């Protein structure tokens, strides 16, 4: 089930744009954004609190939200045919999840499960895609940070 539908174990935190902008500035993802860009991004977000063991995204299903982990931990697991799911990465505060929502197929490539009570900022996919289509500064900032995140996640898997 998509996070945008507030599944069992999730609570939406009501937060106005200035408060969400301040929260975003405390993350590694949002701290270096220009203040105006950070405010525009914050206007698209909402805060969600998640219980331990909550599935935030499920492999093979539509990815509807881009999430930014504010606190807690999320195990990203990959399901392989005939095998148990494997944890391929553990996300920490400042990491993003659900980036598939920005791709044309928007299908999740892994499953994310909270390892502890967690808080995240969610950006609904269609609203975010519309915003980056009309705001090149916002698009550049988001894509730059997403590519950096992907590169960080791939680094431990490099073999020489």
Show the residue positions of the predicted features.
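Cytosolic regulatory regions built on CNB/CRP/Popeye-like sensor folds
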Residues: 1-160
């Amino acid at each position: 089930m998509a996070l945008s539908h507030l599944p069992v174990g999730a609570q939406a935190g009501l937060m106005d744009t200035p408060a969400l902008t301040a929260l975003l500035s405390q993350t590694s993802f949002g701290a270096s954004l220009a203040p105006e860009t950070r405010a525009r991004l914050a206007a698209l977000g909402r805060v969600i609190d998640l219980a331990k063991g909550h599935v935030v995204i499920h492999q093979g299903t539509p990815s509807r939200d881009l999430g930014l982990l504010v606190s807690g931990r999320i195990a990203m697991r990959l399901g392989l045919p005939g095998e148990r799911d494997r944890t391929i990465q553990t996300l920490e505060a400042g990491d993003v999840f659900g980036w598939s929502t920005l791709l044309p197929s928007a299908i999740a490539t892994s499953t994310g499960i909270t390892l502890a009570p967690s808080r995240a900022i969610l950006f609904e996919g269609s609203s975010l895609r519309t915003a980056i289509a009309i705001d090149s500064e916002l698009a550049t900032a988001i894509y730059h940070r997403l590519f950096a995140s992907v590169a960080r996640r791939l680094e431990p898997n490099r073999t020489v």
